[in-house]
Amino acid sequence: MSYKTEKILINTFTAITTLFIIAAIFLSLMFACFGAIYIKSSVRGFSMYPTLNESVESAEQNGDTVFINKYQSINRNDIVVANVEWWPSGAIIKRVVGLPGDEIQILELETQYNLIVNGEVLYSRSKEDDAGNSLNNFIHYQKYLTFLSDLENSECVGVGQNGLPCIKVRENEYFLVGDNWNNSVDSLTHGAVSKNDIIGRVDIIVKLKDNYFFSLIGSMLKIMFN
């Protein structure tokens, strides 16, 4: 081996080693910062299906993994995790559909139930669904009506833009509903959740079916460079 060839090999090895060291330092710093901001949690149940736990077979099984940002502000349509007294078995994970000052209703129509926020239809559930879901929709609607009746004469109840009773979201409270809201215990039957009870916003979802490491790294890099 000539001196020139040997020098090229040494320089190449040094460059590769340096790149590995820089990458290792970068990843270490990234994970350190990440750990200071985020809380990791596994999701159980199907109240956020199909957004979460789409490939999970049992409600008792640990499904998708989420990373909860403790410091970000909360906006409509965010997914958040909260500790609430009416769900003692652990934290709940739901979507923010109502902000302070919003008016929330479920309206029964001939063929469907509409979840209405400030007069606008946010979600719909058909009455013509398969038997199980249709029954769940009906039961959930009846629970909502019971809850609304229990709140009568409370400051939490008002009149919506359509002239029908609505739930009013108070200051420093958020209205949380599961994406699979006919199979969810949430604000529609237990009321809005205090801002102080919200742990944080879900920024990263790692699906059970995905490669954990590469999915997490990809999500972290996306957050960093967006």
Language model feature labels by segment:
Residues L27-M48:
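Aromatic-capped interface at the extracytoplasmic side
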Residues S2-A15, F20-I22, I39-V43, P50-N226:
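Soluble "head" domains of membrane/secretory-pathway proteins
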